[in-house]
Amino acid sequence: MHNFIYITAPSLEEAERIAKRLLEKKLAACVNIFPIKSFFWWEGKIEAATEFAMIVKTRSEKFAEVRDEVKAMHSYTTPCICAIPIERGLKEFLDWIDETVE
């Protein structure tokens, strides 16, 4: 099985640092990074922030390692690190993830 792991970070620099670490450790085949505007509840009030979202492409069994690695590097006390199962996909793409992630 395969996952997209959705992660948010407060800056492009932090997102890139996390992405590079996951790739260097072969925990991800690819990481997409894009800017987002987030609205959320925090400490009893609605907040808004510019953040950077990451989509990590990996194997399902790597979730715990990715989560632990990201949590150790992340500046947020409660970072968004959520796995989204890939139910179907192009076989060659999924094979590439399998071949790339160790």
Swiss-Prot record:
For this chain, one GO molecular function annotation is: copper ion binding
Which InterPro entries does this chain map to? CutA_tolerance, Ion_tolerance_CutA, N-reg_PII-like_a/b, N-reg_PII/ATP_PRibTrfase_C
The UniProt entry's GO biological process terms, in alphabetical order, are: response to metal ion
Q: Belongs to which family?
A: Belongs to the CutA family.
Purpose of the protein: Involved in resistance toward heavy metals.
Name under which the protein is recorded: Divalent-cation tolerance protein CutA
